[in-house]
Regions:
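Active-site bordering "gate/hinge" segments
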Residues: 1-222, 228-231, 320
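Dual-mode signal for accessory low-complexity, basic/Gly-rich regions
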Residues: 187-323
């Protein structure tokens, strides 16, 4: 019922000439679509993941292996005559590993998620996830409860990205800044951190779960520097906020569904590597904490306050990782 009315749904009821937007680069080509894959095809990989984790450590008591996949068919057109179609796959393979030792129980989780098809599932991926889940769980049996207090925190690459995402990334989303909710609402083009820090939001990493060929308003996925050399250089924009600030959209417009208005949200947000090695950073700390992984975070973007639970990490003493 909607389609016949779309060509005349513009001001003055003038016919609308729809022009399909050219796909310059596909960041998630799919060789084996999930629509062509049966449950019978997927089950062996779950069984392999389950068996592999049990085989790696005799303390394993229980395994919860899971796999999910979705396919979104996005058809978009607007009153400016822009039209595009995007095929967006998503797959996640993960496992919870539960171990018991001397009456004590610990659990760990490992997973991988990409915009890939059935070809993503492989023995190599199963092995990586299994080893990571077992290693993470095994490490917790050696964990101690450190003394409380204020001390430096060194964040390891990868797992600590949740802190960057929650504590910093959301504060750069332009709707919060446009409404003066974010602590960074008046900090654009000002120095906000150390000059060696560069923070990026990237929607163009091949097969990354945050990547998009086009966002939900038709803007192309792109790489945006939020912080460059310590200076806040850009917010994450949808079309409304881009017009408000007099800039171009950054490819971050996202809708929960076609029933919802778009809002600017992150793609893949990360801090670029610097010139200082991890070992040099650790050796510079007299007493502190090195964090592998965070969990259970709470953030107040207006106040800039955040709290996270350290899932796994080490004490730093005299510039060395100890326990």
């Amino acid at each position: 019922r909607l389609a016949p009315r779309m060509p005349s749904a513009t001001k003055g009821n003038k016919p609308l000439n729809l022009t399909e937007k050219e796909l310059k680069k596909n960041y998630y080509t799919v060789a084996s679509p999930w629509e062509e894959v049966s449950l019978k095809d997927k089950m062996p990989y779950l069984q392999k993941l389950n068996d592999r984790i049990f085989a790696l450590d005799k303390r394993v008591h229980k395994v919860q292996a899971s796999q999910s996949d979705t396919t979104s068919h996005i058809f978009f057109c607007n009153s400016e005559g822009v039209m595009f179609y995007d095929y967006r796959p998503m797959v996640t393979l993960g496992a919870v590993c539960i171990m018991e030792e001397d009456g004590k129980t610990e659990n760990g989780y490992a997973a991988r998620a990409y915009r890939r098809g059935f070809d993503f599932l492989s023995d190599e991926v199963v092995d990586v996830i299994a080893r990571e889940a077992v290693d993470q769980t095994s490490l917790l049996f050696k964990a101690i409860k450190p003394k409380g207090g204020e001390m430096p925190v060194v964040m390891g690459a990868g797992g600590s990205g949740i802190l960057l995402h929650e504590a910093i990334g959301h504060t750069f989303e332009a709707d919060f800044n446009r409404k003066n909710v974010s602590i960074f609402a008046d900090q654009l083009n000002k120095k906000v951190c150390n000059e060696h820090i560069n923070v990026v939001d990237d929607g163009t990493i091949p097969f990354n779960r945050g990547s998009v060929n086009f966002d939900d308003e038709g803007a192309e996925g792109q790489k945006t520097y939020l912080i460059k050399d310590g200076v806040l250089t850009s917010y994450l924009h949808d079309r409304i906020s881009a017009k408000h600030y007099g800039v171009e959209p950054t490819g971050n417009g996202r809708r929960e569904s076609f029933r919802n208005m778009p809002i600017p949200r992150m793609r893949a947000t990360y801090m670029e590597a610097g010139n200082v090695s991890e070992s040099d950073i650790i050796s510079s700390v007299k007493k502190g904490i090195f964090v592998d992984n965070f969990t259970n975070g709470q953030v107040q973007i207006g106040a800039g306050d955040f709290t996270f639970f350290v899932k796994s990490g080490y004490m730093i003493e005299d510039g060395k990782l100890t326990q």
